[in-house]
Amino acid sequence: MQSSLPQFTFKWPKGPEAIILTGTFDDWKGTLPMVKDPSGAFEITLPVTFDSPSSKFYFKFIVDGQWLPSKDYKVNIDEGVENNFITEEDVIKQRENGSSTLVPESTGLAVSKNAPLIEPEAEKRAKKLRKFKIKRVIKTNKQTGERSIFSQEVVELPDSEDETQQVNKTGKNADGLSGTTTIIENNVGVNEEKAIKPYEENHPKVNLVKSEGYVTDGLGKTQSSESRLYELSAEDLEKEEEEEDEDKGGGKDTSTSADAEASEDQNKEPLSKSAKFEKPEEKVPVSSITSHAKETSVKPTGKVATETQTYETKQGAPTAAAKKIEAKKATRPSKPKGTKETPNKGVQKNPAKNGGFFKKLAQLLK
C-alpha cells in the first residue's frame, strides 16, 4: 500500500561503499541506510511532510562513516554546520518531471522506517526447550583419589518447573565432596544434578588392647608386671635348709635348739588359730615365708643373744594379729648369702634363714 504523503527520492553518485541518510526525520540518529542500484549509485525514497509552504526538510549523508552534505541539493549553514534541505517546491518539481526512478527496495525501506529491521529474538525462542535433570552417583576411591560414575539417571522435567532451579541441599564432609547434592544449570536449559556419595571400603576396625605386660627376670622366667615377685619353691627351700644345717655343724648349742623347740610348741596352737581368720585367696604360701635373724658378732665368747621376731598375718583377727616367737641362737659370723624378695609384704625380712624353724613351721601349717 502506497502512502498518501508526498515522497521524495534522495540520491548519491556511485563510489562509496555505504551511505546512510539522516536528518530531522530521525533526530539525526543515522538509522536509514541508502540502497545501492545496479549502476553503483545510491538512492532511497521516503515520504516527507512540511508544516507550511515555507518550511524546510533538513537532511545529511553519512558516507563511509563521514558526515557530508551533497552538492546536488541546497545547503544551509547554521553556526558553521552545513546541512542539505528541500522545500515543498522541490518535491512538486521532482514529481512533475518524473525524473526519479523508484527502487523497490528503497521505497519499502522508506515506508517502513519505524518497523524494526532485525528479527526479534522472541521468535527464535518460540519453541520451548525440553528440560532434563541428570542424577549421577559418583564414587571416589580414597586411596587413589580416582572418581568414577557409579550410576546415572536422566529425568525429563515437566513444563511447570522453573528453568532456573537452584540448589536446596548443601553439605560437606572431610573430603569436601562426599554427601553433597548439586544441581548445575547449563546454557541449553538442561539441569544436571550430581549426587556425590562417599566410597567407603569396609575395612575391619582393629582395636589394639594392651594386655597385661610381662617381664623376664634374670633366670629366664616370665612373670606378670603387676606381680613381679620372686617365690621360692619347696625344693629350693629344702636345699637352703640343708646348706644352713651344714654351716651350723657341731658349733650349735644344744640349749638353743631345745629352747627353740619349746617356743615352737607354745606357739603351735595360736598360729593354727590365726590361720583360720585368713581368707583362702590371701593366705601366705609356706614356701614364700622368709625369716631374717640379726646376728651379733660383738663377742665370740659363745654367749647366746636373744632376739625377738614378730610375724604378722596378712588379715588376721585383732587378737591374733601379732605373734612373738623367741629363738635363741649362737652369735657367730654367718655365711654371706643373697636374700630374695617375698610376695608377702607383711613378713619381715632378715639376711639369714633358720632352716630348722622353717621345716617345722611347714609341717605345722600343713
Swiss-Prot record:
Q: Does the keyword Membrane apply?
A: yes
> Which subcellular locations apply to this protein?
Cell membrane
Where is composition skewed (Basic and acidic residues) in this entry? 265-284
Q: Which terms in the GO cellular component ontology are assigned?
A: cytoplasm; nucleotide-activated protein kinase complex; nucleus; plasma membrane
Q: What keywords is this UniProt entry annotated with?
A: Cell membrane, Isopeptide bond, Membrane, Phosphoprotein, Ubl conjugation
User: Which stretches are annotated as coiled coil?
Assistant: none
Question: Where can the Glycyl lysine isopeptide (Lys-Gly) (interchain with G-Cter in ubiquitin) cross-link be found?
Answer: K314
One GO BP on record is:
signal transduction
Residues bearing PTM Phosphoserine: S160, S288
What InterPro entries is this protein classified in? AMPK1_CBM (IPR032640), CRP1_MDG1_kinase (IPR050827), Ig-like_fold (IPR013783), Ig_E-set (IPR014756)
Q: Where is the composition biased (Acidic residues)?
A: 233-247
Single Gene Ontology MF annotation: protein kinase binding
Pfam families, alphabetically?
AMPK1_CBM (PF16561)
Which family, according to UniProt?
Answer: Belongs to the CRP1/MDG1 family.
Instruction: Tell me, in a sentence or two, what this protein's role is.
Output: Involved in G-protein mediated signal transduction and in the regulation of polarized cell growth in pheromone-induced cells.
Known PANTHER family for this protein?
5'-AMP-ACTIVATED PROTEIN KINASE , BETA SUBUNIT, CRUCIFORM DNA-RECOGNIZING PROTEIN 1-RELATED
**Official protein name in the record:** Signal transduction protein MDG1
The organism of origin for this protein = Saccharomyces cerevisiae (strain YJM789) (Baker's yeast)
